[in-house]
Curated annotation (Swiss-Prot):
<keyword id="KW-0119">Carbohydrate metabolism</keyword>
<dbReference type="Pfam" id="PF00232">
    <property type="entry name" value="Glyco_hydro_1"/>
</dbReference>
<dbReference type="InterPro" id="IPR033132">
    <property type="entry name" value="Glyco_hydro_1_N_CS"/>
</dbReference>
<dbReference type="GO" id="GO:0005829">
    <property type="term" value="C:cytosol"/>
</dbReference>
<dbReference type="GO" id="GO:0030245">
    <property type="term" value="P:cellulose catabolic process"/>
</dbReference>
<protein>
    <recommendedName>
        <fullName>Beta-glucosidase A</fullName>
        <ecNumber>3.2.1.21</ecNumber>
    </recommendedName>
</protein>
<comment type="similarity">
    <text>Belongs to the glycosyl hydrolase 1 family.</text>
</comment>
<keyword id="KW-0378">Hydrolase</keyword>
<keyword id="KW-0136">Cellulose degradation</keyword>
<dbReference type="InterPro" id="IPR001360">
    <property type="entry name" value="Glyco_hydro_1"/>
</dbReference>
<dbReference type="InterPro" id="IPR017853">
    <property type="entry name" value="Glycoside_hydrolase_SF"/>
</dbReference>
<dbReference type="InterPro" id="IPR018120">
    <property type="entry name" value="Glyco_hydro_1_AS"/>
</dbReference>
<keyword id="KW-0326">Glycosidase</keyword>
<feature type="active site" description="Proton donor">
    <location>
        <position position="165"/>
    </location>
</feature>
<keyword id="KW-0624">Polysaccharide degradation</keyword>
<dbReference type="InterPro" id="IPR017736">
    <property type="entry name" value="Glyco_hydro_1_beta-glucosidase"/>
</dbReference>
<dbReference type="GO" id="GO:0008422">
    <property type="term" value="F:beta-glucosidase activity"/>
</dbReference>
Length: 455
């Protein structure tokens, strides 16, 4: 096998607190927006919730021994803010801190590097009650929480991620309303975008100014956008190109630009102002504040699953006059096209468009309809094929000069898939939610072997 993954390449797997921990109200934990959102009827498929999830809170030792058997070099997980500050601020909950003490110690004992996401969507409900991420005050509440946790674990946790997928936090939570807190207001979503960026900068700045010996980055879900031009004899007009490009800026550059260049994409802001989706004063102050607070992160995390193919459609009811195309090909259970070339294209585009930065693929994986066969096994050959192709795209990107340092498969185990409840399985470990039994899928053994051969 071609040994072109660099020495020390971080092979990992990823999870998130709300999706696996369960124990939603145990040991002093406060209510999060996902607790509230899932307990309200009709928000989640089949009324599923994360009250128990994979019960990782009580079974983390078993889960860490599975990680060790897998041969993971690193494990990416998130801390539940509501376990540390049940109300989001004020009194610290010692039992919450002690849980993460035990988890982190267990990982380190087993030679697995903990990579910690500070915020993976489970905001304390008490903070949502005062506006959540749309309230500028939240920047300070987040800062206090983040610095408390970083200072407690800085000797054992060297890689920190401020936010997981700010795009989803802002637009799925505050515009489309399909994620907690379920708000549907584009202007509010833009306030959220800005709070997230300022919160990110504030933590990175404090870590650097106080010479804390850790690295801080952020994880963005990025989707390369392709213009549908394959229609016979069709000439793409300038307006089409521009609209598809603007839609890509909303998905990608709206976060990449401030994080790596210290400014929002101006063309996009102008368009939103013109469409009355953003106040012109607000657009000015957003640019100004990002410029003043900008600080370059230590690394960039990328979550990649698929691409988007779009074409111009003046009858579209979306923000831009475009619609999605679904090219012929292989799709996962999420209805996402399997397109490994997109990962390569994305990595090369970032390398060519932005200042140099170490990159980690912080999530990549696929949901398939996994079943336990009579022999008690899960034969997930499609997932193996998916991972193989994406690892290959990553390897090719490294050969082309991309500074890729690690790769985290989503996910270590099947878990609560947000609005889809438990209907979509992403794990390389199967979870029987009735019994909490863990079953290693074929992809577990494939990844175990792949790590061995590429370390």
């Amino acid at each position: 096998m071609d040994m072109s993954f660099p020495k020390g390449f971080l092979w990992g797997a990823a999870t998130a607190s709300y999706q696996i921990e369960g124990a939603w109200n145990e040991d002093g934990k406060g209510e999060s927006i996902w607790d509230r959102f899932t307990h309200q009827k009709r928000n989640i498929l089949y009324g599923h919730n994360g009250d128990v999830a994979c019960d990782h809170y009580h079974r983390f030792e078993e889960d860490v021994s599975l990680m060790k058997e897998l041969g993971l070099k690193a494990y990416r997980f998130s801390i539940a803010w509501t376990r540390i500050f049940p109300d989001g601020f004020g009194t610290v909950n010692q039992k919450g801190l002690e849980f993460y003490d035990r988890l982190i110690n267990k990982l380190v004992e087993n030679g697995i590097e903990p990579v910690v996401t500070l915020y993976h969507w489970d905001l304390p409900q008490k903070l949502q009650d005062i506006g959540g991420w749309a309230n500028p005050e939240i920047v300070n509440y987040y800062f206090d929480y983040a610095m408390l946790v970083i200072n407690r674990y800085k000797d054992k946790v060297k890689k920190w991620i401020t936010f997981n997928e700010p795009y989803c936090i802002a637009f799925l939570g505050y515009f489309h309303g399909i994620h907690a807190p379920g708000i549907k207001d584009f202007k509010v979503a833009m306030d959220v975008v800005h709070s997230l960026m300022l919160s990110h900068f504030k933590v990175v700045k404090a870590v650097k100014e106080n010479n804390i010996d850790v690295e801080v980055g952020i994880t963005l879900n990025l989707t390369p956008v392709y213009l549908q031009t394959e229609r016979l004899g069709y000439k793409v007009s300038e307006i089409e190109r521009e609209m598809v490009s603007l839609s890509s800026q909303l998905d990608n550059q709206l976060f990449l630009d401030p994080v790596l260049k210290g400014s929002y994409p101006q063309k996009l802001l102008d368009y939103l102002v013109q469409k009355d989706l953003l106040d012109s004063q607000k657009a000015l102050s957003m640019q100004q504040e990002v410029k003043e607070n900008f600080i370059f992160p230590d690394f960039l995390g990328i979550n990649y699953y698929t691409r988007a193919v779009r074409l111009y459609d003046e009858n579209s009811s979306w923000i831009f006059p475009i619609r999605w195309e679904h090219p012929a090909g292989e799709y996962t259970e999420m209805g996402w096209e399997v397109f490994p070339q997109g990962l390569f294209d994305l990595l090369i585009w970032i390398k060519e468009s932005y200042p140099q930065i170490p990159i980690y693929i912080t999530e990549n994986g696929a949901a398939y309809n996994d079943i336990v066969t009579e022999d008690g096994k899960v034969h997930d050959s499609k997932r193996i094929e998916y991972l193989k192709q994406h690892f290959e795209a990553a390897r090719k990107a490294i050969e082309n000069g991309v500074d890729l340092r690690g790769y985290f498969v989503w996910s270590l185990m099947d878990n609560f898939e947000w609005a889809m409840g438990y209907t979509k399985r992403f794990g390389i470990i199967y979870v029987d939610y009735e019994t909490q039994k863990r079953i290693k899928k074929d992809s577990f053994y494939f990844y175990q072997q792949y790590i061995k051969e590429n370390s």
